[in-house]
Amino acid sequence: MREGDISSPYYRDLAFVTYMGMTALDSMLAAFGKRDDISSGGKQMPSHFSKREKGILSQSSPVGTQIVHGVGAALAVKIDNKPNIAIATVGEGSSNQCDFHEGLNFAGVHKLPFVCVIENNKYAISVPDSLQYGAEKLSDRAIGYGM
């Protein structure tokens, strides 16, 4: 990723947001709800990462919603004619939510500069991946959206 790219991570993405520039101090201030938390002044839930100057969008709690946030950011990038991308990350369980499908469909129809990364955790809470999707690979879902 490069400067100006936008990311919409999910709550398990501590390693990703650290790579994107969040510090251990940033994470601890957020986790302990401290006033100096750069994301929200201590008002956001733990693991709801954001850092504006690094292009990390704030997230909402329901899984899968980071997809539509990322797709919206990709639409803004396209409208502004910028050379950047937007990326959203989800677990395989989130890829079964309506926000995931609606977001990918919109991104595909409008040919947006959007990347979706699905982290296959093998279980969505208590459901094994063998009972979550019928495709051989999760990436095969992109074909249906013209990606």
Predicted feature locations:
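Cofactor-binding active-site loop characterized by glycine-rich and histidine/acidic residues
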Residues: M1-H110, P128-G134, S139, G144-G146
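Short, proline-centered helix/strand-breaking motifs
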Residues: P113-F114
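Short, ordered loop/turn segments at secondary-structure junctions
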Residues: R12, E119-K122
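Active-site flanking residues adjacent to catalytic metal/cofactor-binding acidic residues
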Residues: G91, I118-E119
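A short acidic, helix-capping loop that chelates divalent metal ions and anchors anionic groups
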Residues: A124-S126
